[in-house]
Amino acid sequence: MKTNKKDEETGGNVYAHLDKTSVLQEARAFNETPINARKCCFILSKLIYIIQQGESIGRTEATEAFFGVTKLWQSKDVSLRRMVYLAVKELAEVSDDVIIVTSSLTKDMTGREDLYRAAAIRALCKITDTGMLQTIERYMKQAIVDRNSAISSSAIVSSIHLMRKSSEVVRRWANEVQEAVSSDNHMVQYHALALLYQIRANDRLAVNKLVQKFSKNALRSPYAVCYLIRIATRCLVDDDQPDSSVFTFIESCLRHKSEMVVYEAARAIVSLPQTTPSEIQPAITALQMCCTSPKAAVRFAAVRTLNKVAMAHPNAVMSCNVDLEKFITDPNRSIATLAITTLLKTGAESSVERLMQQIAGFVNEISDEFKIVVVDAIRSLCSRYPRKHTVMMPFLAKMLRSDGSYDYKKAIVETIIAIIEENPDAKVAGLAHLCEFIEDCEHDNLSTRVLHLLGREAPKTPNPSSYIRFIYNRVILESTKVRAAAVTALAKFGAQCVDLRPSIQVLLKRCLLDSDDEVRDRATFYLKMLTEAAEGLIHNFILDGLQVSPSGLERSILDYLRSGSYSSPFDLRVVPVTQQALSQPEKRVPQLVEEEEKPKAPKVEPYAAQLAAIPQFAALGPVFKSSTRIALTESIAEYTVHMIKHTFANAMVLQFECKNTMNDQLLLDVSVELEDPDGEWETGNTVQIDKLPYGEVHSAFSLLEFPDSGAISGSLGAILKFKVMDVDPTSGEPDSDDTYEQTYVLEEVDVNVSDSVQGVAKSSFGSAWEALGDDATREETFQLSTVENIPDAVKKISEILGLVPCERSDRVPEGKTQHTVFLSGVFRGGYDVLSKATVAVDPNDNSIAMNIIIKSNEPLVADLVISAVV
C-alpha cells in the first residue's frame, strides 16, 4: 500500500518493465533456506505476470523455475502456498515433468485445510492427463458434492475443462453433478448446470429433458436460470418442431424477481428467428422496464437490445420511443448513441433531421464501434425513407473524411454502395463522394471495392466521362493492387461507352509501360478486346468476366496437361462454374435491410477432392454443382440422414450424411437403397459406411446415371439399410458379435431441373440476350395458382429453374401489377441459359399469370428448362 504522498506520485505498474532473464534469475531465491515467503510471493507474481503477457519462456528455463517452485511446498505461509498453485497452473504448459507434483497436490486436495483444497483441485486438473485422470476420479466425485461451496465450484469448473481432454471419464460423474445442481449456493448451482449440459450436449433428447425438468423445478441461482434460458433458446432454434412449453418457460422468466434474468429472457425472445410481433411484445415491455433502471449497465443492455430488435421489428419498438427520447441527452455517450440510432430506425420521417443534428454534435466523441452502429442505423433509415438520402449522404461523406479504423470506413463505404444500388436518385451523389474518398484512401481493399463499383455503375450515369479522371489517378499514384483494379474499371468504361472508347484506348496504352506485369497484362488484354471491337468478346471477357471455380479451373488444366493429348484445345465448358466472377470481390448482400437467412449451397471445392478420392467416382470429371443439405429424416429420429446432390456432366452422385444417435448401438454396412417406381433412373456404383458408432457422422454414396430418355427430374424412394450390433452405452464395446439387419424408410429423393443448372449472373443482360440469337428460344404462358403476389412468383420461378436474377430485376417496386425479371445461368455441359419472365396480376380476380421466354445456345437445353415450368 502507498503510505505517503511521495509513494503516490512515484507509483505505477511495478511490473511494467520486467525483464524475463532477470525474473528467472531472481527465481533462484526459491532454493534458499530458510524460505523468505514475502520475497518469494513477489517473485512468483512477476513470473506469472510475464507468462500471462505472452512472454516466451524456453522449456529448459521453465522446467528449472518449476522445480524451484516445488521446493516452496515446505513453507506453511498461506499466501505463498496459494501463489504456488497459480504458478504450477501457468508453468504446466511450458515445463517438463510437471507430473512430479501430483502427489503433493493430491495430498492438499484431500487434506483438511479448505483454503488449500480448492486451489489444489484447479492446479491438479490442469496438469492431469487422460491416463492419470482415473486415479483422482474418486476424489473429484467427492469434491463435486463437497459442502464447501468454493471446493465444489472449483471441482465442477475443473471438470468442465477436463471435458476437452477426457469427456468419457467426466460423463461418469453425472450423478454427482446432478446432485450439485440442487445446491443452495448460487455459483455451485450455476457451474453444475453448465457441466450437466455439456455432459448431455450430444443427446438432444436428454437436453430437452434437462430443460423440462429444471424449468418446472425453480432454480435458486439467477446465474443458473440465465444459463437455462440460453439452453432453452438453443433447443428452440435447433428443433424443427419447437416445444411450446420451452417458449412458455422463457416467457415466464420475464416476471422473475432478478433484473438479470428478466433481461436474459427478453434478449432470448427477441433473438429467436420467426417470432411474431405478438410473441415479442412482452419482451419489449420488459426491456422498456429495464430502460428505467438506476443501473447504467442495465440501461445500456436494454437500449442495445432494442437497437438490434428495431432492425427486424421497428413497429414493435415504437412503443419505447418516449423512453428512448429521454436518453438522447444521457451523459453516457454509448447509451445516447444507441438511443438515437434506435429512434432513427423507428421514428417518423419528420424527426430525421432533428435526430441527425443531435447525433452530429457528439459523433466525434464516441468510439468507432458505436460509430458503426450509427452507420447501420442510417443504412436502415435510407431503406424506409429513400427521399432522405439528401440528408444522409452528406453526413456519411463527412464521417468518411474523418479519421477511423478500417472496419468503420468499410461500414460507411458499404452503406453508400447499398444506397446507390437501392436508390437510383442517389447514384450520382454517392459516386461523387466515393470518388473523393479514394483520392486519399489508405486501405487498398476499399479502393478496389470502389473502383469495381465505378466500373459497373458510372458508365450508366448521364456524364460518365467525369469519373475517368479519378480512376486514372489511381493508375498513376496507387499500389499495384489498386492500379490493376483501376485498369479493369477503365476497360469497363470502354466496353459500355462506345463514344469514350478511343480515349480509354489511349489511357490503356499508357498503362502498357507500368512497372508491374499484372497491370501491363491487364492493359494488353483489355486493349486487344476493345481494339477488335467484337461485342461478344467484350461482353464475355470484360463485362462478365470468367465465372469459374478457381480450384476447379486449376484441377481441369492439370488433368488436361496430364492427358498428354493436345490435338484439341482446352475446353472451358468442363470447368465448374461459380456465381461470382474471378475478377469480382466477394459476393455481398447489397440490401439496406437485413434479409431472412436462406440455406446456402455448399461450395463445390470441399467436395470435389473428397469425391475424386473415391475410385468409383474418380472418372466422372469435375463437380458441376452441389446442392444444400436436405433432411431425409426428422431431427429427433434415432438415425438422422441428410442428403447432398452432386451433379456432374452426365451423372449425379448422392451423398447421404448419416448419424447414429443410439448410444447402445453400433451400425454396420450402412447404405441407402434407391428405387424409381417409373423405372427411368438406375443406381450405379454405391459406397457404404462400414461402421457408424454412436454420435459420429459418416457418408454413404450412390451414383445416378441420367436416363437415356433425357429426363432430368424425378422422385425416388429411399431406404436406409444397415446391420445393428448392440454395445455397452458407456464404453461403446460390443456386448457380443451378434448382428441383425434393419431398415429405415427415408423421405423421397427428388431430382429437379435446378440440380442441372448453376445460377450465374450476367452484368449486362441485354447484351447477353442479343448475343444468343433466336435459334433456341422457347416461350410459354401459364397461370400461377400457388403464389399470392408478384415477389413470391419471382422468387418461385428462380428456385424452380435454378437461375439467378440479373441487374437487380428481382426487386419489385411496391404497388406494381406487372413486372419483368431477368434470369441467367449455365446448364451442365457449359450451355448458357437466359430467361425473361413477365409476371402480371389480373385486376378482376387477383390471379397471377406468367409469360416466360427461355433462350439457350443449345435447343435441347431450352426444351429441358422450359419443361420444368410447364
Curated annotation (Swiss-Prot):
Belongs to which family? Belongs to the COPG family.
Report how it sits in the membrane.
Peripheral membrane protein
A GO cellular component annotation here is:
COPI vesicle coat
GO MF annotation list? structural molecule activity
**Annotated keywords:** Cytoplasm, Cytoplasmic vesicle, ER-Golgi transport, Golgi apparatus, Membrane, Protein transport, Repeat, Transport
Query: Biological process GO annotation list?
Result: endoplasmic reticulum to Golgi vesicle-mediated transport; intra-Golgi vesicle-mediated transport; intracellular protein transport; organelle transport along microtubule; protein secretion
In its UniProt entry, the species of origin is given as Caenorhabditis elegans
The lineage's top-level taxon is Eukaryota
Q: Which gene encodes it?
A: copg-1
Give the multimer and partner information. Answer: Oligomeric complex that consists of at least the alpha, beta, beta', gamma, delta, epsilon and zeta subunits.
From the Swiss-Prot or TrEMBL record, give the protein name.
Probable coatomer subunit gamma
Q: Where in the cell is it found?
A: Cytoplasm; Golgi apparatus membrane; Cytoplasmic vesicle, COPI-coated vesicle membrane
Q: Name where the HEAT repeats lie.
A: 60-97, 99-133, 168-205, 278-315, 316-350, 389-425
